[in-house]
Amino acid sequence: MLSRSKPNEAYRQASFDARLLGSSREDLVIFCLEDFIENLGRLEMADSRFDAAGRSQAITRCVTALTALELGIDRTAELGASLAHLYGSAKGVLLNSIRQTDVPAITAIKDDFNEIAAAFRGAMHR
C-alpha cells in the first residue's frame, strides 16, 4: 500500500506506525496531541496556499486525532468532562472549517493544544 503513496506520505505513514508500536498509554496521548498540532499547522499552510485537497486531508487527520483522544478519556477522572468538551469543541471548529478555514480559531486551538501537550509531557516526567 505504501508503494502507491507519494514518497513523503509513505515516510509519514511509516513514521506514524513506528511510533505507535510499543508505546505506552501516556506516549500515545502525547503522540495524538503532537499529530493533531502538526496537522493544524498543515491546515494553516494548505489554507494559505488555497490547497483544498491539503485542507481536507489536514482536517481529516485532525478529526481522527481528536477522536482517538476522545476515546482515550477516562470519564471518571477529574478532568474527563473538561477534556471531552475541549476535544468536541475543537472538532466542531474543524468541521465548520471545511468550506472556509477560521484561521484565528485554528491558531488559538493550536496554541491551547501546545500548552496541553507541554503539561502532559511535564506530568510524564515527574
Tell what function each PLM region has:
Residues 1-40, 47-48, 53-58, 64-72, ...:
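N-terminal intrinsically disordered, cationic/polar leader segments
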